[in-house]
Regions:
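Conserved acidic carboxylate
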Residues: 14
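Acidic, metal-coordinating helix/loop segments flanking the phosphotransfer/catalytic sites
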Residues: 37-55
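Acidic catalytic/metal-coordinating carboxylates
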Residues: 66-69
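Non-catalytic signal-transmission and effector/linker regions of two-component phosphorelay proteins
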Residues: 1-9, 42, 107-120
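Two-component/phosphorelay signaling modules centered on CheY-like receiver
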Residues: 17-36
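Active-site residues of response regulator receiver
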Residues: 59
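A Lys-centered signature of the CheY-like receiver
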Residues: 104
Length: 120
């Protein structure tokens, strides 16, 4: 990222606190801003509907609840997002299989490459 362009701000949705903190640190190291970092489906829905951010990182399973209603909101708003899952892209329902997905655990370089493609 160049200094002349605004820093993309991201919505991070991850229910596991330590993973959410690690993800925030990775994003900071990669030069991204955090618009919000939340761990529940209700918080994610609210921010997805009203929030001001460039893209989102969505954990597929939030304490037993699936993230897909939030993904639908983002898609309707035209905002890019990437799924994060411990089960791989093939575990995503058919309508979401073409979307970017990172399989846990992933490295910062994988996140960097995925976000660069998402925001280009």
């Amino acid at each position: 990222m160049t200094n002349s362009s605004p820093v993309p701000r991201l919505l991070v949705v991850e229910d596991e606190y330590l993973i959410r903190m690690l993800l925030e640190d990775m994003l900071d190291d990669l030069g991204y801003g955090i618009a919000a970092a939340v761990g529940t489906l209700s918080e994610a829905r609210q921010i997805a509907t009203d929030g001001n951010f460039s893209a989102a990182i969505l954990d597929v399973n939030l304490d037993g609840q699936e993230i897909y209603p939030v993904a639908d909101i983002l898609a309707k708003r035209g905002l890019p997002f990437v799924f994060v899952t411990g089960y791989g892209e093939r575990s995503l329902p058919e309508p979401y299989r073409g979307r970017p997905a990172l399989q846990k655990p992933f490295q910062a370089e994988q996140l960097k490459t995925t976000l660069a493609g998402l925001l280009s």
